[in-house]
Amino acid sequence: MIHQYVLFSSRLAAYAYAQIHDECWPVFDKRIGIAVTSGKTIDDCGQITGRLFKNIATRFFLEKRAAKIHETIVGILKNTSEYVGVIQNMKNETDHVALSRAFKKFHDFQALKKFLLKGKCHEKFKVYFQPCHV
């Protein structure tokens, strides 16, 4: 299931990039071309350029969100594996140093456990996880 969320964040980033590359720039080029051929100067095209940058900023937000999802998942997995490692290497139940280190990682361990035990939480996003047929 975690693989599906990583895949989702990857597809979200790819979608944001494709939107900028395939949609924003061609529309901008077309509008600027029409404006210049109709006699407007580049200074007159500020509104067109402003719309381009607004569209790019919106798409970059999606890409940043995708990166944050991926970063969060990787952090949770890292902390969970460290938690399990600390617990496995405890000398005894009263090893306070190990317990202190494990306690710091316990929150992410619990979050991952709840996430994996929910089972159907990915049903809401099922449409995003379908294989991409190119």
Enumerate the predicted regions with their spans.
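Extended, charge-rich low-complexity regions and/or helical-solenoid scaffolds
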Residues: 1-134
